[in-house]
């Protein structure tokens, strides 16, 4: 940027159409967050009515993660072929319909299936909204675009907590899910009133349709095998999270089978850049493993271990959700200032100072607990607002929505595993200790994976001929692409 451009406030670099695009996507993400966290708020009520064990109840949270990988792939491919806008609208309709079905669910299996539908819609909303906004904003503001957008999910969680405190004590838990149908009205408005993303229009204007991940996997020469593997993965995930398997060895084998299938899909769809894709899935997996035990089981911890009433639970969750929302915005500024990866690492390191105190002080002082949660979530969860920007930078425009959607949502299976891990550990320890120990230890893994830029590093080790040296979204260099003692111009720079 020129000196004159740098002196202009960042928000003046955006025109009205870009702000409208952001506002529409942000509201969609808010509604996504609202619908998704409802189950966590009423988990104890659902558990009591359906007579579920703690692990079974936690699996209702996990169900939405089980289907996310397929939703991210299919709806992401829709976004790559037909535009980000259509994928956004379809995603909102899916997660709204699933939420309504939860309100009518007569038992565990029906609600589990409804949660699968929510997961597919949520995955599509994540990939399509993130790529839509990032590709609509100027390159030097795309960390802000990512962070500001993802804050909508946390705001949706805050709104859901407040609605929970007003609705559930009077009308019961089912009424909360009936409210979740409202986003469909918003989806119809979106279809008519928002423009298409600029990057997508430039890439596809007047050109033949691109070959998407769905084309590669389900219309290519290996389509029969891939369909069989898709069904196998779905079945394995079902048994892992809803089949009530008691044998840990069987669960481990099924988990390894799913991992092999997802890696196969990544290798087929990304070619020589498969090491980058696989490592991105690992990064996201651990990002969910460190953050989602708290996200999913914090309401249960507040109601059971601390014996808070619904009103107090809602107030504490307000601090938590608002902290995450503020953190997403702060992360956007940090990412544009320090760089995406450096901002991520610094924020996570700071969050580690707070995670133990959050669960050590007990529930005697609600305000102190709320403030600690605010800052811990601001630093630890909020920085995930720039994760779409981080992932999207490794993919070209014509495969970004599906690449981001599939990679992120396969890794998001960590979010399916996280609450069950927390519940299992809580059978031997108290729930607060289980949540703190999981989050504290796994955060360090994410710090190493992102700080060392392991996607680029592993790509350089295994398939250096396909190494990308610069971020495809903002053009900044990847630190892991540069070997120690070598000049950057000795590396192969792939076409962005």
UniProtKB/Swiss-Prot annotation:
<feature type="transmembrane region" description="Helical">
    <location>
        <begin position="92"/>
        <end position="112"/>
    </location>
</feature>
<dbReference type="GO" id="GO:0046943">
    <property type="term" value="F:carboxylic acid transmembrane transporter activity"/>
</dbReference>
<keyword id="KW-0813">Transport</keyword>
<dbReference type="InterPro" id="IPR020846">
    <property type="entry name" value="MFS_dom"/>
</dbReference>
<comment type="similarity">
    <text>Belongs to the major facilitator superfamily. Sialate:H(+) symporter (SHS) (TC 2.A.1.12) family.</text>
</comment>
<feature type="transmembrane region" description="Helical">
    <location>
        <begin position="170"/>
        <end position="190"/>
    </location>
</feature>
<dbReference type="InterPro" id="IPR036259">
    <property type="entry name" value="MFS_trans_sf"/>
</dbReference>
<keyword id="KW-1003">Cell membrane</keyword>
<feature type="transmembrane region" description="Helical">
    <location>
        <begin position="406"/>
        <end position="426"/>
    </location>
</feature>
<keyword id="KW-0812">Transmembrane</keyword>
<feature type="transmembrane region" description="Helical">
    <location>
        <begin position="278"/>
        <end position="298"/>
    </location>
</feature>
<comment type="function">
    <text>Catalyzes the proton-dependent transport of sialic acid.</text>
</comment>
<feature type="transmembrane region" description="Helical">
    <location>
        <begin position="353"/>
        <end position="375"/>
    </location>
</feature>
<keyword id="KW-0762">Sugar transport</keyword>
<protein>
    <recommendedName>
        <fullName>Sialic acid transporter NanT</fullName>
    </recommendedName>
</protein>
<feature type="transmembrane region" description="Helical">
    <location>
        <begin position="247"/>
        <end position="267"/>
    </location>
</feature>
<dbReference type="InterPro" id="IPR004742">
    <property type="entry name" value="SA_transporter"/>
</dbReference>
<feature type="transmembrane region" description="Helical">
    <location>
        <begin position="22"/>
        <end position="42"/>
    </location>
</feature>
<keyword id="KW-1133">Transmembrane helix</keyword>
<dbReference type="GO" id="GO:0015538">
    <property type="term" value="F:sialic acid:proton symporter activity"/>
</dbReference>
<feature type="transmembrane region" description="Helical">
    <location>
        <begin position="148"/>
        <end position="168"/>
    </location>
</feature>
<feature type="transmembrane region" description="Helical">
    <location>
        <begin position="224"/>
        <end position="244"/>
    </location>
</feature>
<keyword id="KW-0472">Membrane</keyword>
<keyword id="KW-0997">Cell inner membrane</keyword>
<dbReference type="Pfam" id="PF07690">
    <property type="entry name" value="MFS_1"/>
</dbReference>
<dbReference type="InterPro" id="IPR011701">
    <property type="entry name" value="MFS"/>
</dbReference>
<feature type="transmembrane region" description="Helical">
    <location>
        <begin position="116"/>
        <end position="136"/>
    </location>
</feature>
<feature type="transmembrane region" description="Helical">
    <location>
        <begin position="431"/>
        <end position="451"/>
    </location>
</feature>
<feature type="transmembrane region" description="Helical">
    <location>
        <begin position="58"/>
        <end position="78"/>
    </location>
</feature>
<dbReference type="GO" id="GO:0005886">
    <property type="term" value="C:plasma membrane"/>
</dbReference>
<feature type="transmembrane region" description="Helical">
    <location>
        <begin position="313"/>
        <end position="333"/>
    </location>
</feature>
